[in-house]
Structures are given as structure tokens and as C-alpha cells.
């Protein structure tokens, strides 16, 4: 039987077409399977929660049953650190996977510029339902990177808009009760999500940010039971201040429990990575905005039933900039060159090999001007204060607290010990070095001791190398304070909404 070339060619073409269709179908099924198996993500972010102010991290005096339950079902990170102890710069760093000086949002209230990439937009591009609820604090350019944004009113947590030198000390309160928690839309957003898509939720609380209300908890914390660090005075007013702070943590914990319950109701818990952390330390002097552990250490808890061993603890160093590449890796995506953090997925699997040897943090303008940097390894911390002529004034909300007023009173009476006076010290040491094993509260600066000269030189060199890697630039002028450091009154420099970094440069307020 003769074989015709035309027949052979036509048959081959049909086979190729069939093969192509089959492969396309198979690849489509494979991609569909990958999408179906991609985990969901829920990030719950506290506002001004100290790392050791929940039960799972050692403070059993605070009522946090839901966070304790989350910890018992997931992994606690005992050495997790933020890149900044200031609200918006810390959040920008988490989302961009970059250090504050790389984001152009390193000062408080500076919005994230449109040019910056944030990891939720990669998830949205891949078909995730990406939504945020609660405190926003990211700037207008980031809204379109989310499918839905439900921002709570935070006007009651700052002085009146555009208040300046003539303003009084009154707050413009516009919410009360649970609405002040910043969490009232968390569960609603989870219920109203697109059920046909994997989801990423950024749930940002306002609790336990100041100012505080009385009687917000059905089970108020007794002032006599609060745990005070040695750098705060032990007086009745300070204890009452801490008790109100504990009450707000308890309210936050209640909303965390509601989210966890809703995930169970939706049968989504098993395939959802739940991440809990705080944006900076507690809103007290020498905590929030400081580079001590009380400012930059965060109570990171991650639960993922399919992978993470329940009630496990990780003692390796982790930085907030590592969260973005880790989430992207868990979703099956490469991080890309803009993310400078390191994925720690291996730690979630229980592997103990360290992913980093040190963490780095920045202190920049937050109500008051300052510029300090820190390097921390497992045992030692090095801090360099570039504006050592200025005192380490607490942020304005902490400076208005009963705790700081007590510190001021005791200092005026000559009764405030040296260990509680660092907020008033000017000039400060140019360099600080602490042995965290021997001095966990960082009260004894050993930078000038010859016995620690090698450690000081090593960490100083690490800081200089970090500056080169991040291409950090030294500002040519200082940013004006928005409050008087003695009276706490607003200055003419206070403008709301605060200008972006670029506008401040254009207006000559700062020089980069």
C-alpha cells in the first residue's frame, strides 16, 4: 500500500494538535490545583503591644486566652524583631520587606510612596482576595494594591487635625467602646470575602494604643498585680496606667478569638496561615520608639496546622523584613530583588538552622527628631546615637501618660534613680553596648569597658557594612519637632495630614 506524504503530514499535524490540547488541559489542571492548594493568610497586627505582655511570652497577669490558644496551636518566635519601633515605618517595612531607610517612609506618618512594592499586590495579581480592615496608616497610594480597605477612624488618637501652636491638649474623640479597638470590621471582612478565591487579610488593630478609657473590660486588671519593668517607678498612678493598658490588650485578645472562631466556622482554619505580631513596643517611656528590646522585639506567633508543630518555639533570629519573602514563598512565588529580607519557611518546618546572624533596626523622627541605629545578635546589642545631643524623649502619647508624669515629678523631687532617668539624659552616649544575657533590660552600658572592645568593634563593623548594603544616606538637616520637649505643646511644625517625604524635600523642610 503506497504511503502518501500528504497523509503523513496531515496525521502528524492532528496528533500535534491533540497533544497540544492535552498538554494545555493538563497544565491548566495543574495550575488550578496549585491555586486550589495555595494557603490563605491572615495577619493580625497589634498597635503598641509589648513583646512580653501576653501570656504566651511570660506575662500571666494579662488576660490573653485567645492569644495563648493561638500559641498552643502554632509557633512562638522568641527572637523576632522589628526594623523600627514606630508605627507607620514599622508597617511599611513589613509590607515592603525593606528597611525603613529604603522605603522613603521612615518617619512617622510618611506614606509609602507609589514606587514601592508591597507583597499583597503580588498575591492580588495571582488571584487572591486581598483586603485590609482596621488602622490603615499606609498612605493613599497603597489602597489600590488591596481589593477592599475598611479603615477605622483614628482621629481620637491624635490631637485635632492641623493643630499647631495655638491648640489645647484636648483630644478630638469620635469613637468609643469597641469601635476604638480598630477591630470591629475584622470578622465582617472575613465573612464577606470572595469565597472562590484564596485570601489575604491585613487586620490592623488600634489596641492597645493610647489614650485609654476606663471600664472597657468586664474583668479589669488589678493595678496591684501588674508587672513593672525596673526602668519605670512603682507608684499607684503608674500601676493604674499599666492596668488600663492591660485592659486594652484583653479587648484585642477578644477580637483575635473572634477571627479564629470564624475561620473554624468557615472550615478554613486548616489551610490558613495565621500571623500575629505587634508594630512596636508598649506605649510607655523607654519602650515605644526606643531601640531597646522593649521597643523593637515583637510577640510573633504563626499557626499553620498542616506544617507547624503545635506549641513549638523558635529561638532563631527573625526580622520583620523576613515576613514578606516568607509569605510569598508559602504562596509559591519568588520574592524578587526588591525584598531584602530572608524567607524563614525552614524554621516553620521545625528546622533549627539559622536564617540570619543579626537583626538591624532604625530610630527616626517620631513626634520628636532622633536618629539612632541598632545591631543585635543572640547575645549583644550595639546602638549608635547620631543625634546624641538630644534626649531620648518618649513619643507624644507616652509623654502625656501618667507614667511619664510620675517620672517627671520624682525627678523634680530628686527621687528618680539613674536606671529610670535615661529619657531625660542629654547628651547621651554616642555608642551603647549591652550584654543581653547578663542585662536583659539594657540598663548597663558596657561600650566603654576594655573587656568588651572586640565585641564593640565587631558590631560597629556590622553596622557599617549594613549601611553600605542598604545605601543609607545621612540627612543634611534635622526634621523639626512637632511638640515642645518640656511642655508637650504642639509646635507650628505640626501639620495634618503630614506631608510626604518628597513634599517636605520640595518645600525645603528637610534636606536628604
Model-derived segments and spans:
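Formylglycine-dependent sulfatase
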Residues: 3, 16-432, 440-461, 468, ...
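A contiguous binding-surface segment within folded domains or other stable secondary-structure elements
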Residues: 435
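A glycine-rich phosphate-binding loop feature that marks nucleotide/adenosyl-phosphate handling sites
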Residues: 479-483
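Bacterial N-terminal signal peptides that target proteins for export
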Residues: 1-15
Amino acid at each position: 500500500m503506497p504511503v502518501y506524504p500528504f497523509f503523513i503530514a496531515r496525521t502528524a499535524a492532528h496528533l500535534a494538535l491533540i497533544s497540544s490540547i492535552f498538554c494545555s488541559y493538563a497544565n491548566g489542571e495543574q495550575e488550578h490545583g496549585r491555586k486550589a492548594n495555595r494557603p490563605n493568610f491572615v495577619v493580625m497586627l497589634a498597635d503598641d503591644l509589648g513583646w512580653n505582655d501576653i501570656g504566651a511570652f511570660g506575662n500571666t497577669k494579662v488576660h490573653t486566652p485567645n492569644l495563648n490558644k493561638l500559641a498552643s496551636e502554632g509557633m512562638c518566635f522568641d527572637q523576632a524583631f522589628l526594623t523600627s519601633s514606630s508605627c507607620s515605618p514599622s508597617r511599611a517595612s513589613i509590607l515592603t520587606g525593606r528597611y525603613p531607610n529604603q522605603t522613603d517612609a521612615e518617619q512617622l506618618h510618611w506614606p509609602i510612596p507609589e514606587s514601592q512594592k508591597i507583597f499583597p499586590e503580588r498575591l492580588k495579581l495571582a488571584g487572591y482576595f486581598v483586603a485590609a480592615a482596621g488602622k490603615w496608616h499606609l498612605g493613599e497610594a497603597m489602597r489600590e494594591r488591596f481589593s477592599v480597605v475598611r479603615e477605622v477612624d483614628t482621629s481620637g488618637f491624635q490631637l485635632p487635625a492641623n493643630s499647631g501652636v495655638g491648640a489645647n491638649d484636648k483630644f478630638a474623640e469620635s469613637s468609643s467602646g469597641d469601635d476604638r479597638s480598630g477591630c470591629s470590621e475584622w470578622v465582617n471582612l472575613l465573612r464577606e470575602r470572595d469565597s472562590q478565591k484564596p485570601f489575604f487579610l491585613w487586620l490592623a488593630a488600634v489596641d492597645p494604643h493610647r489614650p485609654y478609657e476606663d471600664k472597657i473590660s468586664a474583668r479589669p486588671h488589678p493595678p496591684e498585680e501588674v508587672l513593672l519593668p525596673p526602668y519605670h517607678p512603682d507608684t499607684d498612678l503608674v500601676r493604674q496606667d499599666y492596668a488600663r493598658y492591660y485592659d486594652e490588650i484583653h479587648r484585642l485578645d477578644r477580637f483575635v478569638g473572634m477571627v479564629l472562631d470564624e475561620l473554624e466556622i468557615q472550615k478554613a482554619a486548616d489551610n490558613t496561615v495565621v500571623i500575629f505580631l505587634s508594630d512596636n513596643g508598649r506605649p510607655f517611656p523607654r519602650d515605644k520608639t526606643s531601640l531597646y528590646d522593649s521597643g523593637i522585639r515583637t510577640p510573633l506567633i504563626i499557626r499553620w496546622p498542616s506544617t507547624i508543630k503545635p506549641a513549638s518555639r523558635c529561638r532563631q533570629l527573625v526580622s520583620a523584613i523576613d515576613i514578606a519573602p516568607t509569605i510569598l514563598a508559602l504562596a509559591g512565588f519568588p520574592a524578587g530583588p526588591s525584598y531584602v529580607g530572608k524567607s524563614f519557611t525552614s524554621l516553620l518546618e521545625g528546622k533549627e538552622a539559622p536564617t540570619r546572624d543579626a537583626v538591624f533596626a532604625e530610630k527616626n523622627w517620631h513626634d520628636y527628631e532622633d536618629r539612632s541605629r541598632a545591631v543585635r545578635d543572640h547575645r549583644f546589642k550595639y546602638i549608635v546615637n547620631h543625634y546624641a545631643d538630644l534626649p531620648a524623649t518618649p513619643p507624644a502619647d507616652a509623654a502625656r501618660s501618667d507614667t511619664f508624669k510620675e517620672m517627671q515629678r520624682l525627678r523634680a523631687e530628686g527621687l528618680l534613680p539613674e536606671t529610670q532617668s535615661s529619657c531625660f539624659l542629654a547628651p547621651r552616649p554616642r555608642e551603647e553596648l549591652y550584654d543581653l544575657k547578663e542585662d536583659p533590660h539594657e540598663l548597663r552600658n558596657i561600650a566603654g569597658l576594655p573587656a568588651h572592645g572586640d565585641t564593640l568593634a565587631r558590631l560597629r563593623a556590622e553596622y557599617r557594612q549594613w549601611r553600605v548594603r542598604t545605601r543609607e544616606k545621612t540627612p543634611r538637616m534635622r526634621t523639626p519637632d512637632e511638640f515642645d520637649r518640656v511642655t508637650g505643646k504642639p509646635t507650628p511644625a505640626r501639620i495634618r495630614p503630614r506631608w510626604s517625604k518628597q513634599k517636605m524635600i520640595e518645600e525645603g523642610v528637610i534636606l536628604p
